[in-house]
Regions:
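Structural recognition of the conserved hydrophobic beta-strand(s) that form the central parallel beta-sheet
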Residues: 112-115, 128, 139-145
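Charged, glycine-rich active-site and insertion segments that engage polyanionic ligands
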Residues: 1-48, 56, 64-67, 137-140, ...
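Conserved alpha-helical scaffold flanking the Walker A/P-loop in AAA+ ATPase domains
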Residues: 13-18, 87-111, 119, 123, ...
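AAA+/P-loop NTPase substrate/partner-engagement loops
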Residues: 56-88, 149
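Glycine-/small-residue-rich active-site loops that bind phosphorylated ligands and cofactors
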Residues: 37, 84-85, 119-120, 239
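Localized chelating/binding microdomains
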Residues: 78-84, 101, 110, 163-164, ...
């Protein structure tokens, strides 16, 4: 049920209006940050759309609902990268386009879920565009993305756009309390992009403790021109999926602290840098953005070595 993730309700309420009036566009673009449980919304929507008895909810017992529950519905198609981290190819989209020209096997809607839509390469995007321009009757494309800027503008313009907004801090904290997490620092949400689901996972798997260890090590490494940075570089390599984001959040909060800004989600180490050195913090953050772009473009690079170079540069500007 969507009650599990109440922040999904506003988008569902709008989708439900379209289902009840049978005014569903040929293409929907569903956007959210990662970790907001959007897969639950997709499941809920697909079951309601394909149900043979009710217009805006799944009855749970018709033939279509039973097929959906067993993941064998012939009119529900998922288009995903064949391997994690790879692109959705033009051949996959062409196969999807051919299916879109066929009739529904259960005389209802046909639903094509493309996830993540931003992983389509250029050829795949262009192939899909032709189908979106002339969608078949009772044929719906649901494009799911965490980064809509990577989609072709022409594709975005042909979709009805819905955004799942992260819950407010108050709503997220309340949800985590309901899950049994009573003592959650507000800054944990920031480290997890506002996602209470990811924050809860971070608390349970030790990621929050790992961040605090990184924060202490980084601040110590930036405390004097002669400080050792090797431990911090090793930690960054060990937590390669998170450390660059951790450093970014810490530096941006530290810049705010230089101007006396205080926020509920501010990281505890933000006030521990050398005072009156906004320019140094800005320079370090700018170099970090360049490093992040480099690592994203070339995933095979040695992060520990690159982190070492960045830490040396940061130490110079933060200790000056």
């Amino acid at each position: 049920m969507l009650n599990d993730y109440p922040w999904l309700q506003p988008v569902w309420d709008n989708l439900k209006v379209g289902l009840e009036s049978d005014r569903i566009p040929g293409a929907l673009l569903l956007q959210s940050e990662q970790g907001l449980g959007i897969e639950k919304l997709i499941e809920f929507f697909s079951q309601a759309l394909l149900c043979q008895n009710y217009a805006s909810e799944a009855c749970g017992f018709c033939h279509s609902c039973q097929l959906n529950q067993s993941h064998n519905h012939p009119d529900l198609h998922w288009i995903k990268p064949e391997k994690e981290g790879k692109a959705i190819t033009v051949d996959q989209v062409r196969a999807c386009n051919r299916l879109a020209q066929e009739s529904s096997q259960l005389n209802g809607y046909r639903l094509f879920v493309i996830e993540p839509a931003d992983s389509m390469n250029e050829s795949a995007s262009n192939a899909l565009l032709k189908t979106l321009e002339e969608p078949g009757a009772k044929c719906l494309f649901l494009l799911v993305t965490h980064n809509q800027e990577r989609l072709l503008p022409t594709i975005r313009s042909r979709c009805q756009h819905w955004v799942v907004a992260p819950p407010s801090t108050e709503q997220a904290m309340q949800w985590m309390r309901e899950q049994g997490a009573q003592q959650v620092p507000a800054y944990a949400l920031k480290l997890n992009m506002g996602s209470p689901i990811k924050t809860l996972d971070a608390l349970n798997n030790g990621d929050l403790d790992a961040y605090l260890a990184f924060e202490r090590t980084f601040i110590k490494a930036m405390s004097s021109p002669a400080s050792d940075i090797s431990e911090c570089a090793s930690l960054m390599a060990k937590h390669s999926d998170q450390s660059l984001d951790w450093a970014w959040y810490l530096l941006t909060d530290a810049q705010k602290a230089q101007f006396g800004v205080s926020e509920a989600q501010m990281l505890p180490g933000a006030i521990k840098f050398q005072p009156n050195n906004y320019n140094g913090l800005y320079s370090s953050a700018k170099a970090l953005m360049d490093l992040k772009a480099q690592v994203q473009a070339f995933p095979g690079l040695n992060l520990e070595l690159l982190s070492m170079y960045w830490l040396i540069e940061s130490r110079e500007v933060l200790c000056s």
